[in-house]
A protein has these predicted regions:
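Acidic/glycine-rich C-terminal interaction modules and beta/coil loop segments
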Residues: 2-103
C-alpha cells in the first residue's frame, strides 16, 4: 500500500483521493498512476473535471470534463480516441481539485 500525507487543513472533510487508471484525460495532462483529489460537497459547474458514474447499477467511474446542456450532462474525455458520454442520469461523485504525480 501507498499513502499520501497532506495537511488536513488544506481540504474540506468531504475531500477524497483516488488513483487515476484511465487514459481518458491524457491530453489534459492527467495520466494513469496520478493521484487525483476531489471534493464531494461542491456543486458541479459547466467545465469542471468530475468523477462520475451512472446512477443505476454499479457503473464504472469516469474522470471527464463536464458540459451541462439544459437537463443533459455530457462527459467529455480529453483523449481524441474516446467518445463523449451523454446522459440525464449521472451521479457526480466529486469535483477534481488537484492532481499529484510521483516521479
Amino acid at each position: 500500500k501507498e499513502f499520501l500525507f497532506v495537511p488536513i487543513s488544506s481540504y474540506s472533510p468531504s475531500a477524497f483521493a483516488f488513483r487515476v487508471t484511465s487514459w481518458s484525460m491524457k491530453e489534459g495532462g492527467i495520466l494513469p498512476g496520478d493521484i487525483a483529489i476531489a471534493e464531494k460537497e461542491r456543486e458541479p459547474k459547466d467545465g469542471d473535471i468530475v468523477l462520475s458514474k451512472a446512477r443505476e447499477g454499479e457503473g464504472r467511474m469516469e474522470l471527464r470534463r463536464l458540459r451541462i446542456r439544459g437537463s443533459l450532462m455530457e462527459l467529455w474525455p480529453e483523449n481524441d480516441s474516446m467518445g463523449i458520454t451523454r446522459s440525464q442520469n449521472l451521479e457526480i461523485c466529486g469535483i477534481l481539485t488537484e492532481i499529484r504525480r510521483k516521479y
